[in-house]
Amino acid sequence: MVRILRKIKSAAVNPLKSSQPLGAAFAFLGVEGAMPLFHGSQGCTSFALVLFVRHFKEAIPLQTTAMDEVATILGGADHLEEAILNLKTRTKPKLIGVCTTALVETRGEDCASDIANVKLKHVEELAGTEVVLANTPDFDGAIEEGWAKAVAAMIEGITRSGERTRQPKKIAILPGCNLTVADVEHLRDMVESFGLKPVILPDVSGSLDGTVPDRWVTTTYGGTSVEEIRELGTAAQCIVIGEHMRHPAKTLHGLTGVPYAVFQSLTGLKAVDRFVSLLSAVSGAAVPDRVRRHRAQLEDALLDGHFHFGGKKIAIAAEPDQLYQLATFFTGMGCDIAAAVTTTDMSKILQKVPAEWVQIGDLGDLEALAAGADLLVTHSHGRQASRRLEIPLMRVGFPIFDRLGSQHKLTILYRGTRDLIFDVANIFQANQHAPTPEALDPFRKREMPDELRSSPLTRH
């Protein structure tokens, strides 16, 4: 059984985690015509906005209620109402996703009642715009919890409840926040290859894929439509990727009765085989030849790459589901997990991480535990530890701001697992130190007796 080591420091040294409000805003960004709204001070929003822009290299729609000292004391209901009405007038969003911050949560504001009053008071002004609330205090949880709460809030607030007529080819997919833009796009292609029609919530592949719109857009310009969220109850099956998305799936099941299947990871041959089998069973179709070819390519990559992985020591710092995804990938390739650090102990998936223990902590803990490892695996803030320890760094997760194209890398299904094998094997090869001639032949520099040095044989 994995031991979960609690955080004992009173401060964070080179923080690992991102906050719940950021995770909720991230999920809202996967909806078409959405505008995430932080209910808090301007600084909270500015910090999250900087992280998003540095990671995606895109213009990110994100607004704030701009709570000041007076609102903090007297209450922020007026600021929230003013912000919602201003956003409706100026940007005309289809969805306003309100994310609470530590400021209003600590004060104990009843944001749900405040939003209900705003909706009741301004029925005509807010026509055509959904307003959804995600309670996401910064002091609790991390990006995974914020993402999951936002998705659950959208389902609760928008999806029509009750048993609906099922569309046999329609599949609802709830991806975790650890999937990249390329992962979500590849996931859709895989599902569509079986003749199924996926509805992905949230769909960041449509809104954060780097597409430049032909006109200025004040909200998100792609992603899942509000109408698709409203009709999720007509799906024949819900597929969940990541343990943190189990709660939104339960919410959908409770509202509409849609059955769900949870895949805690889609990286690795066995996990993907199970996923493909489910798609084949739901669709009633045989596995397409293209998918079979991708599987054969992965098998070849496993043969080519396993020489470079065996016995390597890996130190990973990531969110719980991504930690599980990567740790199972590396151990499946013959590596040992030398250090496993994560952000929060709220996820049950930590009990399945293939390591002796998991430390709840930060990148300072990773640096202290990673001595002797062959590879560090974390986001861009791990680069200082990599430099000091002289251990190569594989960048994963959020944020990645010192490399381009991180969102266009595949990490799931057959092709993503294949690409991971090649990427990691190439890192190992680029950083291995070739033995010197002296190391291979210890007698090369041996001392010679004086009589042999002066011998005619040595001169010729």
UniProtKB/Swiss-Prot annotation:
Q: Identify the species of origin.
A: Mesorhizobium japonicum (strain LMG 29417 / CECT 9101 / MAFF 303099) (Mesorhizobium loti (strain MAFF 303099))
Q: Which residues form a coiled coil?
A: none
> What GO biological process terms does the UniProt entry carry, in alphabetical order?
nitrogen fixation; protein-containing complex assembly
What does the UniProt function comment say about this protein? Answer: This protein may play a role in the biosynthesis of the prosthetic group of nitrogenase (FeMo cofactor).
Q: Give the pathway listed in the UniProt entry for this protein.
A: Cofactor biosynthesis; Fe-Mo cofactor biosynthesis
Q: Could you tell me which residues belong to the region Disordered?
A: 436-460
Q: Which PANTHER family match?
A: LIGHT-INDEPENDENT PROTOCHLOROPHYLLIDE REDUCTASE SUBUNIT B
GO MF terms, alphabetically ordered: metal ion binding; nitrogenase activity
Q: Which domain of life is it from?
A: Bacteria
Family statement drawn from the similarity comment of this UniProt entry: Belongs to the NifD/NifK/NifE/NifN family.
Q: What is this protein called?
A: Nitrogenase iron-molybdenum cofactor biosynthesis protein NifN
InterPro entries, alphabetized: ChlB/BchB/BchZ, Nase/OxRdtase_comp1, Nase_comp1_CS, Nase_Mo-Fe_CF
Cross-referenced PROSITE patterns:
NITROGENASE_1_1
